Amino acid sequence: MTEQTPARQASHANRATRAEIWRLIKPFWVSEERWKAWALLLAILALNLGMVYINVRLNSWNRDMYNVLQSRDYPQFKSLLWQFSGLAFVFVAIAIYSVYLKQALQIRWRYWMSTRYLDRWLAHRAYYRIEQGQEGRLSDNPDQRIAEDLHALTSDTLSLVLGFISSSVTLFSFIHILWSVSGPLSFTALGQSWVIPGYMVWFVIAYAAIGSGVVWWIGRPLVGLSFNQERFEANFRFGLIRVREHAEAVALYRGEPQERAQLTARLDDIRENWWNIMRLTKKLNVAVNFYGQFAVIFPMLVSAPRYFSGAISLGVLMQISDAFGQVQDALSWFINAFTTLASWKASINRLAGFHADVERAAGMPRTLAVTQHGGSAVTLEGVQLSFPDGSLMLRRLDARVESGEHVLISGPSGCGKSTLIRAMADIWPYGEGRIALPQDAPAMFLPQRSYLPIGTLRAALSYPAAEGSFEDALITRYLGLCRLAHLASRLDVAANWSQALSPGEQQRLAFVRVFLNRPRLVFLDEASSAMDGETEEALYAALPRELPGVTVISIAHRETLARFHDVRWKFVPPAAGEGAGHRVEALPIAV
């Protein structure tokens, strides 16, 4: 989870084009899931059409029932009750299975999209490059995009599409009923006689058009406000998680007042934006509720003269009222769905930005090539490293590390030592040159702070291999070697091990991983900085003993570790007149 850069993202809030929307929605419907997806969709549409048909039947039933009540025809009244029971039973069954199949289609779509987005986010280390390229990002919090926005996209898209289709079918089913039963409207104006056939149809169209226009005019800022609300909520949640992750450091620094101030500032953003949403929603609700309530009485007001003149019966009056309501509700799809549309559009915008970030990260031009070759040495040819802004960090480096050789990288803090390790791990794209690693030599990279997945200790020790890949006896042996024997009885205990273990224990656990996975190349980026000197030296001495022929490239500041290495790569600051960028001197280490 990361905090966003608001200026660029806010400008992207309303930019999702129809092409981007189609690019987000289309893939699932042409994928290997398409047959099941289309079958479910067609089944849902068929059920929805069935509900429209039942509503048409109920419209006629409504007319007959009020006519029966007006004529006090008790036998026909009982017959209509039985008829209603059958229609109601079928309607309820259709409604239940329509929702059930819609939920089934939704989870299929969401699961398919989530797995594809996870693949894209994790492929080519896009997740890492997105975090590194903060200034050019269009989206924030990839976890929220995948977990929440994909859910909203699938749910809202189905609701909107199915609702629109049902409204369209309802409109065409009832508009001819309304036309036929409303009859003509005759009046005199401007000295002429006028006749409007099916006048209720024109009234309902005008009524819905005016209402939709008013709602759109009032509610159009809601998309941007919804976008910002999600952003502010994510930033607040991110701040809370940061306090949890660094609870010990915050406590030691007595940083509670500062953390509270920062969290309160983010909470203030949520409150201010929420008040804006409340004010806009209040105006929107005034228009929507006035529109909806007046629609109840409007058809009766317009039809009442014909009823009181005896031109139509009570049943026809109620049929007109019901048909008017059905047509008005169908034409009001935009009004009824406006809040969902605003939320859907905000989700589309965020996903479009996230999609663009992933594509840009995956397609980032690579002038620094990391390849594999059939030899046994690690070679660096013309390697230059840069900062993301293009300024030079490391000047040309040509070097070769033979199989079994141990290299110590040293130099002042911030000179690019860790970046060189990242470049060899193929996660730093800024630079040029060529790095070649042995093809048949699996590698492991140990950062200063190791990643410990939440779960059992066995899973944390086995990572990145699957849990259960190693026998207990082997795990226990290496726990003892790394001075973690006290953890041997807790292999199946699930915990947040990054919180349960001290920094030194976490680094020793990372060495257990190395011994278990037995790589041929080991890169250590201050991977023992939290250990005591005796333990650190014991583990460095164990590397060639437990992994004969292993190649080690490590960064360390303690000179006591030099004796475990063959060569030193010393980062030297540029001399006067040399320009920016450190250079590397390769120096043999006398044993």
What are these model-derived regions, one by one?
Residues 6-11, 72-75, 104-107, 117-144, ...:
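Short intracellular "coupling" helices and adjacent cytoplasmic loop segments at the cytosolic face
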Residues 5-30, 43, 47, 52, ...:
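Intrinsically disordered cytosolic tails
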Residues 43-46, 50, 59, 94, ...:
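A hydrophobic transmembrane-helix motif
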Residues 219, 223, 234, 238, ...:
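Cytosolic ends of transmembrane helices, especially the final helix of ABC transmembrane type-1 domains
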Residues 54-63, 67-70, 91-129, 158-162, ...:
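Juxtamembrane helix-loop junctions of ABC transporter transmembrane domains
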Residues 371-591:
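ABC-type nucleotide-binding domain
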Residues 1-55, 60, 64-84, 98, ...:
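Membrane-integrated ABC transporters
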